[in-house]
UniProtKB/Swiss-Prot annotation:
GO terms classed as biological process: proteolysis
Binding residue positions for Zn(2+): H174, H176, D187
Domain annotation MPN: ranges: 103-225
Coiled-coil regions, chain positions: none
GO molecular function ontology, one term from the record: metallopeptidase activity
This protein's name: UPF0758 protein BCE_4545
Length: 225
């Protein structure tokens, strides 16, 4: 058969994508499509294999920095920026799926909304979701990055954004990079402090969710709110 089917070979992932769809391609082939070309020493698929091996698969690759990518022989600034832009677009698309009038009715809803974004983070991120009177997410904000400590989490930073967004309530989240979402004493102290401040100013802190690896803990369900 003449035409595009005649040129579909192992080294031509773009042609396979056109014929069979993106879903039929392996991770190495999809990465090769983004990279477009290899180097003088290796094909684009071999370069894809090297990148995936360097980052131990997609889990670490999705958070790769420019410096980490260009340290790999065959990956220049142009290829690295293409990959970083593609990964960021993917994150934003996933986020849009949930941001469109996403309502939070339970701790499970909240954990589902943020799990994939937070469970792989290598540092603790303290994030607040700001809700309207219908419990719909109207804004989210990363308040700080680092170990959770009551002397670091300033209520004014948490509630300042609530006033700016005219939020009716707040849900706080942070991740445990260890994968174990069991709350620490500091987690509980920070939560109680924020809840008390919320009572005083009239913006309820509905929950504090701790994200682990496919696991979460609700401090409200644990009786700390």
């Amino acid at each position: 058969m003449n035409g595009i089917r005649d040129v579909v070979k192992e080294e031509q992932p773009r042609e396979r994508l056109l014929l069979e769809g993106a879903g039929s391609l392996s991770n190495r082939e999809l990465l090769a499509v983004l990279l477009r070309t290899g180097s003088k020493e290796e094909t684009v698929l071999k370069l894809s294999d090297k990148i995936l091996h360097h980052f131990d698969g997609l889990r670490m690759l999705k958070d790769a920095t420019l410096e980490e990518l260009v340290s790999i022989h065959g990956v220049g600034v142009a290829k690295a920026t293409q990959l970083i832009a593609a990964f960021e677009l993917g994150r934003r698309m996933v986020r849009l799926e949930y941001q469109n009038r996403y309502s939070i009715r339970s701790p499970e809803d909240c954990a589902t909304y943020m799990m994939e974004e937070m469970r792989f983070l290598q540092q603790e991120h303290f994030v607040c979701l700001y809700l309207n009177t219908k419990n719909q997410v109207i804004h989210r904000q990363t308040i700080f990055i680092g170990s959770l400590n009551s002397s670091i989490v300033h209520p004014r930073e948490v509630f300042k954004e609530a006033f700016r967004r005219a939020a009716a309530s707040i849900i706080c989240l942070h991740n445990h990079p260890s994968g174990d979402p069991a709350p620490s004493r500091e987690d509980i102290e920070v939560t109680k402090r924020l809840v008390e401040c919320g009572r005083i100013i009239g913006i309820e802190v509905l929950d504090h969710i701790i994200i682990g690896d496919h696991k979460f803990v609700s401090l409200k369900e644990k009786g700390h709110i």
